Every structure is written in structure tokens, then in C-alpha cells.
Amino acid sequence: MKTLNSTPRADGFHMPAEWAPQTQVWMVWPERPDNWRLGGKPAQAAHVTLAKAIARFEPVTVAASAGQYENARRQLDQPNIRVVEISNDDAWVRDTGPTFVINDHGEVRGVDWGFNAWGGFDGGLYAPWNRDEELAAKVLEMERCQRYQTEGFVLEGGSIHVDGEGTVITTEECLLNRNRNPHMNREQIEAVLRDQLAVDTVVWLPDGLFNDETDGHVDNFCCYVRPGEVLLAWTDDSNDPNYARCHAAMEVLKNTRDAKGREFIVHKMPIPGPLFATAEECAGVDQVAGSQERDPSVRLAGSYVNFLIVNGGIIAPSFDDPADAEARAILAKIFPDHEVVMIPGRELLLGGGNIHCLTQQQPAPVKR
């Protein structure tokens, strides 16, 4: 499909909010043995559970490598789940897939951001990453969507949350990190976000969740639930390393107005744990130079904020934690018109993320 030389904003396109109607959700089948334990088999089982949970509400497309295609196809043998073959380096389609944008005339296009595995050779999580860099373009080709390419600008989809009405929330920890776009300052990065997402206001939270190996992705920490309202990971424990991060974010949100001039309504979501991998879980991960080391002493960045909104549903992680029930109740109260489905999130978390990181929604065309 055609790669355009303009920007979504110039062409009348914008990134819609996650609660906008969707045609499908994209996923990628996990298999990387230096990230997922036991050759990825427990993570694959978790992906089957996730795909089937989403498929109750809308179609799912799962991309699998040639070597895993038949295995994935057999395990995902369900009418609402399509399996396609796309070579990849890992399963984080939120960060490697396209950011879909829409206009008011029923068209859907996609933004193909630069990708460097969360930092390249300065703190990145694996190398090479060339197949992941190509994944967004292949998805857009399959969907016959025209493509915008941000040549020389690195961004992961997990580092942004939009309200669809002109505001994006992100973190300084990630977007201003020297290992993403060191040649650009804050103002230049904001200009790219305005052009590619068609937003007017960029809300900068200082940091994401403690020990998030993506350098503080906002989708693990603070997300939009409706225009003017966000859900923020929260702890009242002053000894928790997340305490300062949560309170700093709250200060920004309390003193910021969105693109429509609204004050933010902030809902608090408890943080599970602290959660740690067991020695046995860590031992199941292949040790490869340049890949993220797994260590039972390192706290996992578990978060209930890492959920996905689908048509009529909320797909959220549970952690066999005392806070699971409270998290479910909070989501049910915030989303009264959605069915809250919680699925076990531990295997996904052991790989470095969760449900939102491992999914990418494709918005439905809109005609006004």
C-alpha cells in the first residue's frame, strides 16, 4: 500500500480513543526463549486465553512466525480468531504494530513509528529487531491501509494514551529518554505527536511505574477511561518506590487542563504485590547476551492499569493477589456498560508487560 508524505493531521485524520468502536484486535504469538520461559509455552497458553477472551467481543487476528504458524492455528481454532503468518522478533504488538488513525469519511490509515526494541544498544531489550521494525508496515499492507512513516522518530504505542478529543498523555521517563530520540528536544517531540496523532495538548507525567523495563510506558501506569477522566496506578505506602511516582503524576494531573479546558478527574487503581518472579521461573528463560536478564530479586512492574478496552468489554489482568477483587470492582464501576473479564496475567508479566502491551486495537471506520 502507499506510503504517504504528509501527516495524519494535515490529511484530517486522528487517533481515536480506545473506547471508540473497533473492527478487530491484533496480537502476535510469543516464542522468544530468551524472554518467555520454557520456550514460550506457558506464555502461548496465556495468549490463547487472552485471544479467546477478546474474541467473545470482536474479531482477533494473531500473527505468528512460519515456525509457529501451525501450532498457533491449532490452538486458536475458533471462528472469531484469524491466524496470519508474519515474521517477528517478539510479541509486543502495542509497540511494534501500527497506530491506526481515522477521519470522518470512513477511512482508516496507520502510523508506522520507528522501533528500536526499547532503547537500541543503549538499554534496549534485544537485538536484532529488524523484523519487529517491519511488522507495522506488513499489518497495514494486509489491511490495505495507507501508511504514514515517522522516518527517524522512535515511539512505542504503549508510551501514549489519547482521549480522541485532542489530548495525549505520556511520560518524560520514556519519550525524553536519551535512547529513543536523542536528537530531539521536548518541543520537537511534541510537534511530532501533534502531527501524527492530531492532538493539541501533550500531558507529560514525570515517570511510569517503578522497574518498568520499557522505561516507564504510560499504559502500565495511567490510562484514559473517558474524556477528562484517567485511571492512575496508586499506592499509599510511602516506602514503596512507586509512591513518589504516583504522587508526582497526581500533581501534574491536578494542575493540568486538557485540550478542551477540562480539569482531570483521577481514579486511583491499587498496585498489586509487590510481585517477583521465582527462581524457577527465571531459570526457564534462555540466557542470551544483550537480552533482558531475569532475576528473582527484581520487582516486576505488575499493574491493573494494563487492560484493554474492547467493544462492550474490559479485558484486564489478575495476579492471584489480594487486590484483584478491588481492581475488578473499580473497573466495573468506571465502565458500567462494559463486561469486565479478568484473566491470569502472571505469565504475561514475566515477559515484561501485560494485556495492553500485547494487543493493538484497529478502530472501525466512521462516517459523520
Curated annotation (Swiss-Prot):
The record ties this protein, via HAMAP family, to:
Agmatine_deimin
The reply to whether Cell membrane figures as a keyword in the UniProt entry is no
Q: Which InterPro entries does this one have?
A: Agmatine_deiminase (IPR017754), Peptidyl-Arg-deiminase_porph (IPR007466)
Copy the pathway line from the protein's UniProt record: Amine and polyamine biosynthesis; putrescine biosynthesis via agmatine pathway; N-carbamoylputrescine from agmatine: step 1/1
The record, for Gene3D superfamilies, names: L-arginine/glycine Amidinotransferase, Chain A
Give UniProt keywords alphabetically.
Hydrolase, Polyamine biosynthesis
Q: Name one Pfam family in it.
A: PAD_porph
| Superkingdom of this protein's organism | Bacteria
Q: Which reaction does it catalyse?
A: agmatine + H2O = N-carbamoylputrescine + NH4(+)
Name any one GO molecular function: agmatine deiminase activity
Q: Write out the catalytic residues in the record.
A: 357
Q: What is its EC number?
A: 3.5.3.12
Subunit structure and binding partners? Homodimer.
Protein name, entry field: Agmatine deiminase
The enzyme class is: hydrolase
Role summary: Mediates the hydrolysis of agmatine into N-carbamoylputrescine in the arginine decarboxylase (ADC) pathway of putrescine biosynthesis, a basic polyamine.
- Known NCBIfam families for this protein? agmatine_aguA (TIGR03380), PRK13551.1 (NF010070)
Q: Which GO terms describe its biological process?
A: putrescine biosynthetic process from arginine
Q: Which family does it belong to?
A: Belongs to the agmatine deiminase family.
